Amino acid sequence: TTLLNILAALDKPTEGHVFLGNRELSAVSEKEISAFRRDHLGFVFQDFNLLDTFSLRDNILLPLVLAGTPYREMEQRLKPLADKLGITSLLSKFPYEVSGGQKQRAAVARALITEPQLLLADEPTGALDSKATDGLLRLFNGINESGQTILMVTHSVKAASHAGRVLFIKDGEVFHQLYRGEGTDQDFYQRITDTLNLLMTGGGSRA
């Protein structure tokens, strides 16, 4: 979460530099920072962060409304995104009327509606049951394969096993990393589990 806060320009690193594209985050002024986050970053949270008094449609469109995007363009972005995420029939409903998995899909749509350079996901499966978790992870796989960069913080081995690269952070440092390679999710799951067991018992090496 600390790493995500730094990447979101909510916190500043004690040393080093953070770049998004060619822009150094610490060089973005306080006046610009809110617009910078809205235009370049998408956020998905464990608890969805949807407004209960807004329909799913209004929740998803909120970042574009705040950016002053014309209504026609908002609708042009919303339709294919809602279709892809399987929530078109739910857009008029309110968050309290849909399931946790459907809320998270709406939250993902809100994060993607601005066409961000980077999607930040903080424990996105933490509040979901097994079925909804599987659905969200498949969704993330599809989004990633379409060219969207996703950085996910998770304590779930299952969620991590869907990634292309896993970083293990210990005491604030990158302690080890794994790349998926050509193996299956199950193969990668086992490699992640084995690495965690080594780290928990004091083994492993920095990489």
What name fits each language-model region?
Residues 113-117:
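A short, proline-enriched helix->beta-strand linker immediately N-terminal to the Walker B motif
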